[in-house]
Amino acid sequence: MSSAAEQAMPIEFTEQAASKVGKLIAEEENPNLKLRVYVTGGGCSGFQYGFTFDEKKNPGDMEIEKNGVTLLVDPMSLQYLMGGVVSYEEGLQGSRFFVDNPNATTTCGCGSSFSV
């Protein structure tokens, strides 16, 4: 069950993603790290998702906290990610963070690029 604050967030950060971020931060032994999701031009569909760890929040960044870890999204990327879900999956082809984006009109086969 989600709290009212979580329901009001324009991007969802799943339990699986937050748990994996927490494990990765523990491995790095740097509690200041936050997961940043961003959108850049490129990929086979026009835009692509990126994930990186960042120690600082930039002016205008949105912060989404879950289970003691923080997801950061810059204002430009946020406009493309509204209503999206940042998750994490492990499978036969490896593990990855990914975005389920309702704004994407097309996505590439690997799911890392999209168009709007």
From Swiss-Prot:
Cofactor: iron-sulfur cluster
Keyword entries, A-Z: Iron, Iron-sulfur, Metal-binding
MF terms in GO: 2 iron, 2 sulfur cluster binding; 4 iron, 4 sulfur cluster binding; iron ion binding
Bound cofactor: record note: Binds 1 iron-sulfur cluster per subunit.
SUPFAM superfamilies noted in UniProt: HesB-like domain (SSF89360)
Pfam families according to UniProt: Fe-S_biosyn
GO terms of biological process kind: iron-sulfur cluster assembly
GO cellular component terms, semicolon-separated: cytosol
List of residues binding iron-sulfur cluster: 44, 108, 110
Entry similarity comment: Belongs to the HesB/IscA family.
Subunit structure: Homodimer.
Protein function: Required for insertion of 4Fe-4S clusters for at least IspG.
Protein name listed in UniProt: Iron-sulfur cluster insertion protein ErpA
Organism whose genome encodes this protein: Idiomarina loihiensis (strain ATCC BAA-735 / DSM 15497 / L2-TR)
Lineage of origin: Bacteria, Pseudomonadati, Pseudomonadota, Gammaproteobacteria, Alteromonadales
